[in-house]
Amino acid sequence: MFKDKVAIVTGGAQGIGMCIADEFRKAGAHVYVIDIQEGPHYVGDISRKETLEAFAAYVLERHEKVDFIINNALPVMKGIADCSYEDFEYALKVGVTAPFYLVKLFSDHLADAASIVNMSSSRDRMSQPQTESYTAAKGGIAALTHALA
C-alpha cells in the first residue's frame, strides 16, 4: 500500500513518532525522520529555519515528491512558573512554526493525494497546570491544521 511512497516524520527517534516511522517502513515507504536526538536518522533541531531547509534539501535530493508529512515532534512541556521566554518561544517553534515551514518547503513537491498529519492533543481545550507551553503549541497546531485544510 505504501510501496515507494515517501514519508517524513518529525520527532521520530522514539515514542509515537518511532512507531509511525516503523509502520511506514514495514509497509514499504521511504521514511525520513528528523529528530534532535542522535540516531540513524537526520539529526537536527527543527526549531531552526536552517535545519528545516537543509532537511528538505536532503529529502528532495533523493525524491521529487513527498506523500506524507507527519508533524509529530514534541514541544517543551513547562508551566508558567518554570518556563522562560526562550522555553516558550522554543515550544512554539517546534510545535507550530516548524510544521508550518515544513509544509511550505514541501508544498511544491507534494504528490497527488499527499497527506499532512499534524499531531495535536486535547490539551489545547482541556489544559492542566504547569503545561502552558505545551498547551499553547498544541492549540497553535490545531489552528494551523484547520487553516491549511
Predicted regions mapped to residue ranges:
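Substrate-binding pocket helix/loop in short-chain dehydrogenase/reductase
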Residues: G79-E89
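Active-site helix of classical SDR
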Residues: V103, A137
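Conserved NAD(P)H cofactor-binding loop of Rossmann-fold oxidoreductase domains
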Residues: N72-M77
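Residue(s) in the substrate-gating loop at a strand-loop-helix junction
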Residues: S121
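Active-site loop immediately N-terminal to the catalytic Tyr-X3-Lys motif
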Residues: A81, M126-E132
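Rossmann-fold cofactor-recognition segment
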Residues: I36-E50
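Canonical Rossmann dinucleotide-binding motif of NAD(H)/NADP(H)-dependent dehydrogenases/reductases
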Residues: F2-V31
